[in-house]
Amino acid sequence: MMKRLLSMAAIAVAVAASGTELKDLKLKAKTDKANPIDYKVGETIRFDFFLDGVTELPAEAKEPLYVIWKREGDDGITVVGTNGISLAKGCSMETSLSVPGIIRVDAQLVGNDYKIFDSVQRTRNDKGIGVRGGAGAETEKMKLSTKEPEDFDAFWAEAKAKLAAIPVKAKRIEATPDRLKGKMKVYAVEIDCFGPRPATGWLFIPENAKEKSLSACAQFDGYNGNEFKVPQVPEWIPTNRITLCLNAHGYEMVGHDEQYYKDYGDKVNGVAPGAPKRMMYALEPSDYDNPRETYFYYMAMRVMRAYDYLKTLPEWDGKNLEASGGSQGGLQTMWAAGLVDGLTAARPEVTWGCDLGNSLREGGPLISNTWGIPHADGAFYFDAALHAKRVPATCKVEITRLGLGDLACPPRGVLLSYYNMKCPVSAKLVQGSTHGYVPPAPNQTFTISNY
């Protein structure tokens, strides 16, 4: 015990002397080409690994150090390897793809005992000093796996007609927090909608805004699983536009305690007595037996109704109508881009629900499966890559982040949504970015666009 205490004390002294902590040490990666998807089938793809974040190594990570890496690809090939690395000199691995598609590389820094530095919590789900990145070859030739329903457009035309039959009526309750008084008016809004729940959310309107003076944007939330809590007014919202932060579920925003939201979540997720059992909402194949009754159907109705309401606001300039959101919010953003008349700009981030029919999930490599949403014919009506085909030329789309290491919303599907768009579109490729993590600069990024 005394030896262990002395060892810990020695490390503490070393850290204090150097000013370097283990959590500051980063393993990063980049490809030899600036554009990491600018490779040909069969061409050598080189990944360069390097250490960053410190000027000298912390006491817990003295050389010799190694990188243990695993390469997976849409070609079904998995390769593992180990390379030595130092702070002064990185290391590299080379690979290639035999088919148009994506390569993913997972790498971990280890010491001379070949154990990861598991005291470092890199993200909520990842321990160690590691990096997950990717590259692509002839990705423009990848084929969408989702089989487009023959009645896709008729399905959504019918949905719009159902929604149009419900008058656009709303009630607002002012909920402006002290920090925004004098700058913005904030309202808890509830808008009549087709389906079991209204469209609800936080509406922000700049103080003293004049008629027809402002653009309007709907912002959409990510997937919250079983975390249903009392809604809070967002901390930061642009003060030069109208913003509706739409709640994904349509529950009431004010006037309830934690139990109301817990009960709602229990019902949605199959925990409440009598509720259909499921892991979490929208993730069971049986949810899509009737696509007109699935959770996403009513969520999409609320997305469209949000814009019906925004268009009625006297402060809206009548021209600029936008959408933004990440993950599930990115999926909703793409629904809006494909379904809402008059949308002028869409900014999805790490878009969920692209290429839901991915054939690679059946006995093949799993690197390109979108997380959660089942491979079910009824789910294909909600595929973001199919809605991407319907975005009009009058709407400009900016995919603000495409994580090359994203497992939940993998780059293959998001790229397929990009290639399906005929409108002006760009996408920022971020090396080492997983679903909820972006490496600090310097880091490899590259923006692709069709304009």
Regions found by a protein language model. Name each.
Residues 20-183:
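N-terminal targeting or regulatory segments adjacent to alpha/beta-hydrolase or S9 domains
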Residues 225-301, 358-365:
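Cap/lid segment of the alpha/beta-hydrolase catalytic domain
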Residues 9-18:
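Hydrophobic h-region of N-terminal signal peptides that target proteins for export
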Residues 356, 408-411, 415-451:
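C-terminal catalytic histidine-bearing segment of alpha/beta-hydrolase fold enzymes
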Residues 360-420:
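The feature captures the conserved acid-bearing segment of alpha/beta-hydrolase catalytic domains
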Residues 259, 326, 330-377, 429, ...:
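Hydrolase active-site cap/lid region
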Residues 208, 276-327:
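Gly/Ser-rich "nucleophile elbow"/oxyanion-hole loop immediately N-terminal to the catalytic nucleophile
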Residues 201-205, 212-223:
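Short beta-strand element of the alpha/beta-hydrolase
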